[in-house]
Amino acid sequence: MKSLAGHVVKYGKHRERRSFARISEVLELPNLIEIQTDSYQWFLDEGLREMFEDILPIDDFQGNLSLEFVDYELKEPKYTVEEARAHDANYSAPLHVTLRLTNRETGEIKSQEVFFGDFPLMTEMGTFIINGAERVIVSQLVRSPGVYFHGKVDKNGKEGFGSTVIPNRGAWLEMETDAKDISYVRIDRTRKIPLTVLVRALGFGSDDTIFEIFGDSESLRNTIEKDLHKNASDSRTEEGLKDIYERLRPGEPKTADSSRSLLTARFFDPKRYDLANVGRYKVNKKLDLKTRLLNLTLAETLVDPETGEIIVEKGTVLTHQIMETLGEYIDNGLNSVTYYPSEDAVVTEPMTIQVIQVLSPKDPERIVNVIGNGYPDDSVKTVRPADIVASMSYFFNLMEDIGNVDDIDHLGNRRIRSVGELLQNQFRIGLARMERVVRERMSIQDTETLTPQQLINIRPVVASIKEFFGSSQLSQFMDQTNPLGELTHKRRLSALGPGGLTRDRAGYEVRDVHYSHYGRMCPIETPEGPNIGLINSLSSYAKVNKFGFIETPYRRVDRATGRVTDQVDYLTADIEDHYIVAQANSLLNEDGTFANDVVMARLQSENLEVAVDKVDYMDVSPKQVVAVATACIPFLENDDSNRALMGANMQRQAVPLIQPRSPWVGTGMEYKSAHDSGAALLCKHDGVVEFVDAKEIRVRRDNGALDKYMVTKFRRSNSGTSYNQRPIVHLGEKVEKGDTLADGPSMEEGEMALGQNVLVAFMTWEGYNYEDAIIMSRRLVKDDVYTSVHIEEYESEARDTKLGPEEITREIPNVGEDALKDLDEMGIIRIGAEVQDGDLLVGKVTPKGVTELSAEERLLHAIFGEKAREVRDTSLRVPHGGGGIVHDVKIFTREAGDELSPGVNMLVRVYIVQKRKIHEGDKMAGRHGNKGVVSRIMPEEDMPFLPDGTPVDIMLNPLGVPSRMNIGQVLELHLGMAARQLGIHVATPVFDGATDEDVWETVREAGMASDAKTVLYDGRTGEPFDNRISVGVMYMIKLAHMVDDKLHARSIGPYSLVTQQPLGGKAQFGGQRFGEMEVWALEAYGAAYTLQEILTYKSDDVVGRVKTYEAIVKGEPIPKPGVPESFRVLVKELQSLGLDMRVLDIEEAEIELRDMDDDDDDLITVDALTKFAEQQSAKQLEKEAESVVKEEAQDVVQEIETAEDRD
């Protein structure tokens, strides 16, 4: 028997799939959220300490007191993760820092532990809990500090160069040439200064010294001619210093001293200027002589300074081989020259640089100096004079065609700032603010009694951390629609945010796909719209190194034997540029050598066919190019990239269903993505399941200890979907560390399960699937196939008001007993009650202002001592479309010790659950960007059926496929049908999945027709349709855009205060905008009255709309419309400009415009309907009250009279 296509692979303990992959993967996928967890761990272990050591010790102004850092410790968190969620608190731990205060005068030392505020902790899932809500800190993609060179062309077509030294924080130093070939520098974006002025200020004043350092070049000569010695009484260095000061501080008196201190502060003070580790690494790498000298011709003989032997002869071309031997000598300081700056320079320490002379590639007669910065140590975080001189040398070398310009969009020049670093930067801001306070307190307070505790004010530190988590652009409310959305959010990279780009200024180049993204950033997954290309996703295998550059793994190729080894190297983008990398699908022999002599490979931006002996590396996996969500799309290689983008983005919007089913046609990523998302309950230690029910799982460890795992049931997720876990292990089952114990939402058997496998036919039906609409069988509604559970939270708080406290009570004015039937004695709804729109959830009354009493009422009060308890009903009611079943009620009170915000005495939260079946108007999609809206749900018996009588579930329009070029859906359809017939699950990994032959092979094996199509019969008549139709199984998901959330209608409602027009949007209970084009449509029909009422009563004719409402209620004819408010505003604006504007009618009589006087205040500010209703009921009550009061007053008068008679 012929062997079947594919081979069986096990995913987790519970699922087997037939995989069509041909490439064996040598490397497991990394933990998908380690970009979050590792970064935060680094911050706790090293980042915090680095921060304290940077800022402390703090000395006072006299230098007598010194506050030093000893150690820090994070204590036990106040709340667990679950408690923090329940109490709306932060999941955080108190940070205690041990400080030592030394008094240098007395020699006294005081040590003390100081509380530094609560520090938010990261949960195991890579999220933070801030005010009870889960948040994610998105990693930021920024330009790396370092030295960059760029080419530019001026308006006359002359080529020039520019250079920029960018620190992590501090002033920029830019160099540029002008049309006359004079070189200039700019300090911190100010006016430009001739480049030699800065060299002189650094202490190398004479022209001869400058030529000695840099060698002869045309641009340098032009610059020196421009930079004349103007004032003979100043030395050249002092004059240079004054020139710079004049540019940086124009208008201030210039002295050499002030300029020295200014330049020192700008560039050489570690507190003000910081290159950071990454900046120092990039500067050293760019100015490294080993890369700059490659392929140049030596103009001098290089001699070993220790032995005197010749290393390389003059006139030699420096090839790779020669550079390998020369490299060691360069690292050890070959050809180092030390220059001593003059006494009046900014930096007086000697400057050591490496100078090697080569011939210019432009003019082989000319000798050029190539200067290296002498490799300052990693601990040197500021820029040194040697760096400035070496970067100037690089700048001059570019004019001789030595060196190369940088591409800023290359991922070697962009780096990731993850949580740890973002937090560290924020913490630094707080500590710097605190430092000022400490200095001030040191000078004010008595030094004898001073303790560290008295010096420290932790407010600025706490505030900066709070501000970062609460309101930073990078601290985002977690997308928790489903586990894939969660996972993707944690792996997101944003170029926006503080210190990044802005949407409006980001050009096309920044957003575009770059060749260096390969294996580092997904080229497909990015939002559509204004953020396209600015927000990206980390590729599946990518990691972030200690400098923040993204690395991707490659298998090393042994050049000697030609074998592809299993050794994996992680390369950053700039290192990868030097190598030739073969594709992952290159065919290999048994022994690991390449099967063909020529393979497809990449070198920088080129795709080449390369002989195998030239290849250095090979991709580890075909899916290393794409992100996790993209890797979940089967047959991705057959889809157009625009549609794949939609497919990846829409999977994140899938609503978790009641009965999740993982796809029959998967990619093999379903298990890993669900496992790492944080939604599954994972086993922490090996052991045996000892107890399992819906609430709890207990595992007995091998060492006898017992682990308890709580299963989360029906919790509301951030996006209002149900977060529910279901155990999948059995009593007595052996489990290992990392096994899935319980499925989370949208998971089945440990795999991601976003949708359902449904029977789909590509056919039109009576025009109901025009324009991507979807026709669906009622079976999917009846059997709850696409039913989801949604939980909404409503809260009501009882506050203290000026007129007295609000009260949560059952006693509500003007509410019948029937409305109170589900409230308990406190006036709070019972759990399990079914509620409709407008029902009471929490009864609450607010004191009203005591009204002025009439004489009779005052008399009554005097006699009966009754206080008029005037209260307003401010109960919490179910909003429109919010009806369902009360799932939970939480009550927080001060007495119970709950932390409530000031002025709140009690807080009640009610959770209402809705079961939403699929509905016409709901949005659905496949995984290939094939989205549509359900247009008709048909009875099962009317749906077309297969020859065996099975009715299809969904009909899609075949016209949606060819123009969209997402053919993957058709392949999925056929393979899915075969999988259904064979009763198997299949995996077809991206770029290495089932080929056409595999699909047809599986179709044959399943006993389907050779074209995989079938005859379909009309469910209404039983007649077969004319042509054979493609029918198969496709994985369709229901998206979070449901019609229940969008449907909205208003008759009357709130109006905007300024324009008096109805508000807009469902959330404001607004109206529908009748815009300019809609007005044209009515004008075209001549519907004058309809148009008039739309522009008056229904919009901003304030008086007219109230009168109209009254007329409708009383059944009277509708009055004529008045003047719209917007017209009145226009007239008033013209009057305010001094124009005498009046409005006349047909008889030229003036029309009075309503003035904003007190009579109309109520009309303007209060919703007309409620106002009218209140007036009516008030009149009614007044009449009743009057008659009661009169009767009672008469009784009282009679009693008094009778009493008088008796007397």
UniProtKB/Swiss-Prot annotation:
GO MF term list: DNA binding; DNA-directed RNA polymerase activity; ribonucleoside binding
Gene Ontology cellular-component annotations: DNA-directed RNA polymerase complex
One GO process term, biological-process aspect: DNA-templated transcription
Pfam families in UniProt: RNA_pol_Rpb2_1 (PF04563), RNA_pol_Rpb2_2 (PF04561), RNA_pol_Rpb2_3 (PF04565), RNA_pol_Rpb2_45 (PF10385), RNA_pol_Rpb2_6 (PF00562), RNA_pol_Rpb2_7 (PF04560)
Catalysed reactions listed for this entry: RNA(n) + a ribonucleoside 5'-triphosphate = RNA(n+1) + diphosphate
E.C. numbers: 2.7.7.6
UniProt keyword annotation of Endoplasmic reticulum present: no
Keyword Zinc assigned: no
Enzyme class name: transferase
Keyword entries, A-Z: DNA-directed RNA polymerase, Nucleotidyltransferase, Transcription, Transferase
Main function: DNA-dependent RNA polymerase catalyzes the transcription of DNA into RNA using the four ribonucleoside triphosphates as substrates.
UniProt record similarity statement: Belongs to the RNA polymerase beta chain family.
Subunit and partners: The RNAP catalytic core consists of 2 alpha, 1 beta, 1 beta' and 1 omega subunit. When a sigma factor is associated with the core the holoenzyme is formed, which can initiate transcription.
Name by which UniProt lists this protein: DNA-directed RNA polymerase subunit beta
Organism: Enterococcus faecalis (strain ATCC 700802 / V583)
